[in-house]
């Protein structure tokens, strides 16, 4: 199976996911985003659990300020714990909430508490229920290209997918608590989620019906980027159905290609869709217009969630575009 080329086993029996060939290592964010697709989707739940066991050990070491024994890079990035909870949410859907709670409930609780207690060095939970991150001088999101030591896309402050992930994590954690009869914990999490939901809409939704990419004080980034697809695709979203449809429509019109979603709309300033030339030139194009295939999974999920079977043939046609790449 093509997925197996990314599975890595070390001598001590630790299991990892390689971020890519030829030079990418095992990176925390990439691990949690890709793990469900590289394991659960091909019915390899056991390998999911083995990778998660290694990754959990690494994240506990990070939370406790201990030296890392797990060979996972970028574990300090602020969205890593949020993607970890998302990955476990996919495991719960594949198995059951009860099974997920039994194996990973304590880890999920510890991660949520770690964030709520503001113990992460670059993830601050504000009174409005949103997460704030400093990304001015160092790239902190998946759009992490740098040039001359500075992020090409300096996303900072309230970052749209971080807060969509946070709302989703709170609601998922509440649903796990409900599945095992912990009503007190469930209600506490839902109350927190409600605060986050209102602030998310007030902060990110703009007058044109799409979402700001990030907001930092009076600075609102109007760039049309694919990060707004995440709150449409997640199981728990702070957006209403009508709001989701408007966001999806803009993603379809301005970002969708046969091979993925553009990292920036052609109508936005700085659009650069051609990834060629010397390293610096490529760094400036990396997240400024080039299309990314992995985002299509979330786009397709958003389409099916909103339009059900009426979008099935459309999604199938989108997937056909990847066949040549997969059989190259």
Task: Please name every model-derived segment.
Residues 1-328:
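Acidic, mature catalytic/reactive cores of soluble proteins
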């Amino acid at each position: 199976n093509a997925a197996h080329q990314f599975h890595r086993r070390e001598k001590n029996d630790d299991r990892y996911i390689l971020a890519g060939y030829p030079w990418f290592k095992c990176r925390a964010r990439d691990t949690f985003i890709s793990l469900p697709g590289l394991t659960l989707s091909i019915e390899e739940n056991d390998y999911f659990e083995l990778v998660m066991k290694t990754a959990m050990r690494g994240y506990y070491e990070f939370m406790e300020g201990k030296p890392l024994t797990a060979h996972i890079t970028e574990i300090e990035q602020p969205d890593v714990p949020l993607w970890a909870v998302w990955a476990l949410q996919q495991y719960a859907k594949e198995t059951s909430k009860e099974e997920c709670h039994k194996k990973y409930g304590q880890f999920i609780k510890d991660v949520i508490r770690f964030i709520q207690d503001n113990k992460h060095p670059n993830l601050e939970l504000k009174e409005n229920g949103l997460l704030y991150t400093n990304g001015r001088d160092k790239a902190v999101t998946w759009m992490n290209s740098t040039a001359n030591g500075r992020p090409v896309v300096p996303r900072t402050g309230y970052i749209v997918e971080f807060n969509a992930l946070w709302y989703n994590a709170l609601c998922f954690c509440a649903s796990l608590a409900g599945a095992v009869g912990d009503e007190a914990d469930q209600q506490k999490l839902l109350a927190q989620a409600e605060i986050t939901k209102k602030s998310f809409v007030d902060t990110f939704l703009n007058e044109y019906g799409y979402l700001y990419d990030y907001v930092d004080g009076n600075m609102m980034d109007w760039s049309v980027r694919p990060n707004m697809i995440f709150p449409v695709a997640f199981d728990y979203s702070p957006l209403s159905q009508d709001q989701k449809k408007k966001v999806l429509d803009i993603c379809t019109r301005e970002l969708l290609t046969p091979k993925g979603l553009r990292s920036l709309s052609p109508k936005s300033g700085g659009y650069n869709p051609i990834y060629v030339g010397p390293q610096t030139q490529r760094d400036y194009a990396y997240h400024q217009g080039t299309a990314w295939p992995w985002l299509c999974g979330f786009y397709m999920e958003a389409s099916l969630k909103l339009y059900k079977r009426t979008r099935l043939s459309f999604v199938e046609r989108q997937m056909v575009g990847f066949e040549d790449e997969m059989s190259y």
